[in-house]
Amino acid sequence: LSPEGTTQRLREFDRIYVRLQTRSGQVQLGDYDLKLGEGTLYGVQRKLQGVLLTAQLPGAGPVRRLTIRASGAVSKGIYRRQTIVPVEGVQGPYRLTGAAGEPFVLVLPGTERVYLDGQLLDRGTDYVIDYATGELTFTPRHLITAERRISVEFEYTTGSGTRSLLASQAHLELGHSRPVAFLEVAALREADGRRFGETFGLTRADSLALRQAGDGLAVRSGAEQVPFDPEAPYVLYTREVRALPDGTTDTVYVALTSAPPPGTPVYRVTFSRVGPGRGRYVRAGQTVNGIVYVYRGPGQGDYEPVRLLPTPVRHDLVGLRAGVHLWPGWTVGGEWARSRYDANRLSPLDAADDLAGAYRLFLRIDSLTLSVGRLAVSLRRQHLDAHFAAFGRLQPVEFARRWNLDVRDLAESSGASVQPVAETADEAYLTWRASRSAAIDLELGRLRRPGQFRGERQALGLTLGRETTTQFRYHGELIRSRHEVAGARGRWLRQEGRLTVPLGAGLTPYIAALHEDRRQQALHTDSLHADSPAYLEVRPGLAWQRPALQADVSLAWRREADVWQGRRLPSGRTWTLQGRLQYTPGPHFGTTAELGYRRRRTPPRFAARYPLDQTLALHWDGFFRSPGRLLGLN
């Protein structure tokens, strides 16, 4: 691991194992990375500590090859996918939290996959991470603004591991002179131990709460009465009763801004994130004593004044995958999987939805010769039952954006990816390559969630020229959607283009353009919803690359529009300057400097929504190594 991913615990970097190898397989004892069924419904990727067996048996007759893999281990971490809400002008640190809202977790080194606007980032180049604190900071290569989209997949440990994982897979390949068919079966189980309560120090009251919670959130009160202390290193709250519009009342915690009247109860309150639209409180900002949470009402927030209790889980999954190679480059096949996911082994409630299934059907043509050029085709259908639980993400990172879904419609990801509702997706991909320097990509798709959502998507990609010569690339997509639950219909147009013109001597000027127009309207009216932004961005730049030098500078102009009282109005203009210089003349010296500067002009009506008008981010690092490595500086 590079220094840009740090931890103060040396044991988190240790990999201790014993490996025994023969001609037909191997056995590994100790630490290992398990990657099984990658890209399938039953795929899993984990850092484990246990036994891994791999056997490759020679073929006989119609059997070309048989591969068997088996694993029995203790999970070193818990898988989690977290969406981070960016703050305008703040590069970090952003904290990764546990599935139960734990604010301090140990991220397993090397397990994180950080996505910014759907693109996978590189550690050190695009971000730095402290594994001991779970804090993530972005470099000036990417200026973080409120409209950016950040998603992180990682494994973490709370230091009290009780979870084990058993997995097995067999892959059979048939054919004589060439592969004609394949068959693959897999079975997996991940579960917490029976001494779960002792490990986490749960009280009798906690155990009762877990038993009564079913598959829902098990909580204990997050409020603790304390004496009033104006110098307390945490935010103090009082409690009051408020009347709601429907005539009911609610007990509300209100942050203190001054000394309360004598005798008024004062509380220290812990708030936990329970999910979008599932809480009553929102984060209102940072004070000297900590983060302040403000009451918004039932279903209007992401946080609750509670402590989330960890729940012991059991996750079983069996899968089958088969395919036939009709001709060289032609493959037809399918997958089937069935899962059992008990989110709370201590509770007999909510067991009716533990079992669920899923399947995929696909046809893939790698290359079909035409009179002009070659054609590649891929057709796929994927169906997921409600409550189907996978060991990893089954949809693209930007699945919500891909289909104009709300973030709260996505699968949950607290140790497993649990599908919230039944869903069927049909997609087709066609690529026509007229020559080595000309290609057209076409994508068609539809998504159905019976009684809740349906969407249609079309995308077009165009490539003219090669990277070493003048090249033009374009990608555009149009999404139409109808969300019955939200009572909204949408139309989302997105376009992106880039032109590069190499001039020689390592100089390459370029110009890129981005455009989006999202219109969300009520089902039976034409008025725009608040989440209907539009923007146009143009970014010219110049790249210079030499054997020891790499430089890139760009200046972007962006015009934005947002909805104000049902109408779309200009909401701001921004200028963004970004530059990067890397100089490495040899193995003994190297330096990198990065600059990001953004200036925004916002109309008064949108000033509260976009309070910052300037953002500046700088980063510089370097190293020196003397000959013979007698002296080293970083």
Language-model segment annotations:
Residues L1-N634:
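Surface-exposed, low-hydrophobicity segments enriched in Gly/Pro/acidic/Ser residues
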